[in-house]
Amino acid sequence: YQITGDTEFNEIFLSDVRIPHENVFGDVGGGWAAAVTTLMNERVALGGGVPKQGTGPIADLMHIWEERKGSLDDVSASVMRDRISELWIQAEALRLTNWRAREASKSGNPGPEGSVGKLMSAEMNQKIYELCMDIIGPEALTFEAGYERNRGDGSSWARSSLKYSFLRSRANTIEGGTSEVMRNILGERVLGLPGDVRVDKDINWVDVPRN
């Protein structure tokens, strides 16, 4: 189980599998290039959406703010408005960046732009739902993981709650490539920075020394 009470992931092990030559995807020995292309498309799917302005996670934040702002003192409300304004600007910058990336990717060859969107959206989602938890205060501690309530068909009672979204957002910087991996990609492929030292770069996988 995940911290949300969901079970979204599993491992599959295949033994003695042989792939017919006619089913080879891409060039023989070029599997990594195919895998990287797949990952680029996944990252675009995870972080490259172009929603309408003010929708998605930022809409959740605005809704809970409108609902709870009256319970805050003037100083706390002022601090919250500053934090909300900053996140709204980031959300709009991400939306427009994704729009430009989508236009650039219509050539059919996804580039590192997907890593930009994935990195920004993952970290922004976490910041948004962290702020939501700050707004609701101690109520944030009352979420039940719902192991016995998740019916296994994706219709868990908790899926629409802010507390569920906060817990689920913790995975955003891991799935589809960690934020650390995204920064490496952007540093090396976009900014042209020197790559990490790799002593196994020109060694076949089967020949890489293992403990």
Model features per residue range: what roles?
Residues 9, 58, 91, 111, ...:
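Active-site lining segments that contact anionic ligands and/or coordinate catalytic metals
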Residues 15, 19-20, 41, 67, ...:
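Short, well-ordered loop/turn and helix-capping segments at boundaries between secondary-structure elements
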Residues 1-97, 172, 206-211:
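Glycine-rich beta->alpha junctions and the first turn(s) of the following alpha-helix
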